[in-house]
Amino acid sequence: IGKNGAGKTTLIKIITQLLFADKGTVSLFSSHSENEWTKALSRVGSVIESPVAHNHLTAYQNLKYYCMIRHIPNADQVIRETLDYVGLPDTGKKVFRDFSLGMKQRLGIAIALLSKPDFLILDEPINGLDPIGIKEFRLMIQRLNQEKGITILISSHILSELYLLANRFGILDQGKIIREISKAEFETLSEDYIVLKTSDKERACQVLKEQIQLQFKVVNPDNEIHIFGNEQDVKQILKQLTLADVAIDEIYFARQNLEEYFTQLVE
């Protein structure tokens, strides 16, 4: 995860030897030398920046070409199985340049899967996809992980979607990994809180302090107060604020999400 310009694509290009780092080392599948690292790349598939294929060829023809240059046996069977797996079984004579963005992403992943990789790297794969395309992509990636045992590295800034898909997050800022956290760890750290929106902020704070005795913080400039409690506390808060004639615009229960966590780290 990282903002635009944080170094996500640069890091991926270094891992795949498309760029060379000024300093530091890369260990891939426990490689201990540059030669071992290069050999380990045979176990890696990737789609970096945007899917690349021959514009004038169909999906089948593109995979046939890559099977030929990679000397992949039983090409016809491999191609049909791969196209079916990524959801492109019936594209017929349509050529790559006429594909939708979602179809291009699927073909890019199909090309990356031909060599049966253990590690798949995808750079901003859901950019530009519509909601249906994003959901289909998510289901495909989950299948690849669960059915084929492929480890998948995804770079993205669409955090809500990553949260549904990933089980570990690395946060990149200004070229450095500043935090690595599992989904389980994040959920343990996430705070439950009650959001109160009121035009009478000062009076509301006074009531919270004197009558309810829960910790809270004011979030400016939205007249929003975050009260650190659980859902059962909402009724008591409503009761005390109503008795004090505090105007309540909105009140609801919330939990810190990945976007808020990321923003706090990089700002």
Regions found by a protein language model. Name each.
Residues 176-199:
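Conserved beta-strand-loop-alpha-helix hinge in the C-terminal portion
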Residues 20, 186-189, 217-219:
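Short, flexible turn/loop "capping" segments at secondary-structure junctions
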Residues 192-265:
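Short, charged/small-residue-rich alpha-helical element at the C-terminal edge
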